[in-house]
């Protein structure tokens, strides 16, 4: 059965992005279904993070159209855009926590920016989000410099979830984590998806994460999406890069542990 318009939460058509004469994407098409976890993979320089940032509006496309929630954000006023952007949360690779703020204060940043809310309510909501991502209550008072790598990821995720987003954007969420920490983060993403009904758009190179979390995978190569499908579709592909990536030694280890 064909997907209806309501099923598609992110719709990228004919995207072209470039930095000067260097073209990153050309005629790139991608549709993300509501409620799925989609993993974006590709070789170095294929523009995985550029695609994420372009969808977020942090880079202007040179051609093509991007719709999120069925809306072309290029048609919105700045106020309308800010309102719609509250419907998604973002966790960048570096976490982007404010070093001078505690974990709780970091989580409260979106409330202070977008909502008129008293301190007691902000503190209560921040506590809920901190618990939701598996951090202990004591972590609320800690500063980023006092956190482990895994705790920083979870604190950043708590802030991304602050306003109950419909879409969660993740840029290399398990980068820098040890295998145990990465597996725990994968489990958390699965739990949040099922509990909150999230759509998750994830740039990752982590094969274990692809196996553990993704409903579908989109492969970037040759300036576009060359294949989108399930892990089974990836394993059946004869494309040289896909074959090398999904059938190499690391892939076999990931498959064995899945």
Identify the residue ranges that each predicted region occupies.
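Conserved ABC ATPase signature
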Residues: 143-147, 151
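Conserved catalytic motifs of ABC-family nucleotide-binding domains
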Residues: 164
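Catalytic Walker B motif of ABC-type/P-loop ATPase nucleotide-binding domains
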Residues: 168-171
């Amino acid at each position: 059965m064909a997907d209806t318009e309501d099923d598609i939460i992110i719709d990228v058509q004919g995207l072209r992005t470039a930095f000067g004469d260097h073209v990153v994407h050309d005629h790139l098409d991608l549709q993300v279904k509501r409620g799925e976890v989609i993993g974006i993979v590709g070789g170095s320089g294929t523009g995985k993070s550029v695609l994420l940032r372009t969808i977020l509006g942090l880079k202007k496309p040179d051609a093509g159209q991007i719709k999120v929630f069925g809306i072309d954000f290029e048609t919105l006023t700045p106020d309308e855009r800010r309102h719609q952007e509250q419907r998604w949360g973002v966790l960048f690779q570096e976490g982007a926590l404010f070093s001078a703020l505690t974990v709780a204060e970091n989580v409260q940043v979106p409330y202070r920016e977008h909502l008129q809310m008293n301190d007691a309510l902000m503190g209560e909501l921040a506590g809920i989000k901190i618990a939701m991502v598996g951090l202990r209550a004591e972590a609320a008072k800690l500063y980023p410099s006092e956190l482990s790598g895994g705790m920083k990821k979870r604190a950043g995720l708590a802030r991304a979830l602050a306003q109950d987003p419909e879409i969660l954007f993740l840029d290399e969420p398990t980068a820098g984590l040890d295998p145990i920490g990465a597996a725990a983060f994968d489990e958390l993403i699965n739990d949040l998806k099922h509990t909150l009904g999230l759509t998750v758009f994830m740039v990752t190179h982590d094969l274990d994460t692809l196996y553990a979390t993704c409903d579908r995978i989109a492969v970037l190569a040759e300036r576009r999406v060359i294949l989108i499908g399930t892990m089974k579709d990836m394993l059946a592909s004869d494309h040289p890069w896909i074959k090398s990536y999904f059938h190499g030694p690391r892939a076999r280890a990931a498959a064995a542990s899945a």
